[in-house]
Amino acid sequence: MVRKILQKYGIRGGCHDQHFLIDERSLDSIVDQAELSEKDVVLEIGGGIGNLTERLLEKAGKVYVIELDPALVHVLKDRFSDNEKLEIIPGDVLKLDLPKFNKVVANLPYSISSPITFKLFKHEFELGILMYQYEFAQRMVAKANTENYSRLSVNTHYFADADIIMKIPPSAFSPPPEVWSAVVKVVPRPSSFHTEDPQFFLDLVTAVFLQRRKKLRNAIVKGNHLLNVPNIKQIVAELPEEFMSKRAENLEPHELAEIANFIFKMRSTS
C-alpha cells in the first residue's frame, strides 16, 4: 500500500531526510508503544505520506502533523481530507509555535534531530516515541565514562528518562537510508538534581563538551564565551580538584550540575 502511494504521487524520497518507513510491523509497533486512546492529543513531526499518521488517527482523539514539504502536505490533505481528527500544520518545526499535545510520535528528520529534541524538551508532554538515527539514539541514552556520552546524553538525562526500544534496519524504509535507525521512548520528568539556573547549567554542559578532550579546568576557561563569567579563572581555582582534573565525559550529570551551581553562585556574588 505504501509503495502504491509513493507511485501515485510520484514521490521518490531520498532528499530532505525523506526516507519513508514502509515496514508494516515497525509502524504498528511504534503506535503500540505510544499506548494511545481517544483522550490523547498527538504531535507528529514530519508526516511524510501519512503511513504513520493513518495509524495514529485510528487510536488518538486528535493528531497534529507538522510537514515542511509542500508536496507531502498535498498528499496528507488528499489522503485524510475527510478526517476531522487531523490538523495539518505546514512549515518548519523549528520556526513554528507547537500546539498543545500530550504525546509526540514521530520519525524525526535526522539532520535536525538535536534541535527538534531540545525544542520538545521545552514543552510539557507525557510521552514521546521518537525515531532517530541509531548512533544519535545511542548518544541520547549513554552513561558517563562511555564513548557515546555527550552533551546530548546529559541534556536528555536532565529532562527525561530515555530508552532505546526498537532498532530498525535500512530495509524498512523507501528509499533505504545508509544507516540503521532506532526508536527511543522518552518520558519527561522533573530533574533528579538541583540547578540554580537551568540555562546556565545547559550552557556549561555545552561549553565543557565543546572541549571534551581537555581537563575540566581548561574546558571551562576555554568555553567561557558561552558563560560570560568575568572572574572565571579565579572561580575555577576554587573548585575541587577531583572535578577539575577530569574530563566532561567522566562526570555524571549531577556532578556537572554541582559545578554549574558553584560557578553561578560565585558569579552572582562577585
Curated annotation (Swiss-Prot):
Protein name listed in UniProt: Probable ribosomal RNA small subunit methyltransferase A
Report whether Transmembrane shows up as a keyword of the record.
no
Its domain of life reads Archaea
Biological function: Specifically dimethylates two adjacent adenosines in the loop of a conserved hairpin near the 3'-end of 16S rRNA in the 30S particle. May play a critical role in biogenesis of 30S subunits.
GO annotation, cellular component aspect = cytoplasm
Coding gene?
A: rsmA
Which residues does the record give as S-adenosyl-L-methionine binding sites?
H19, L21, G46, E67, D92, N107
What Gene Ontology molecular function terms does this protein carry?
A: RNA binding; rRNA (adenine-N6,N6-)-dimethyltransferase activity
Where is this protein found? Cytoplasm
Q: Which organism is it from?
A: Methanococcoides burtonii (strain DSM 6242 / NBRC 107633 / OCM 468 / ACE-M)
Q: Name one Pfam family in it.
A: RrnaAD
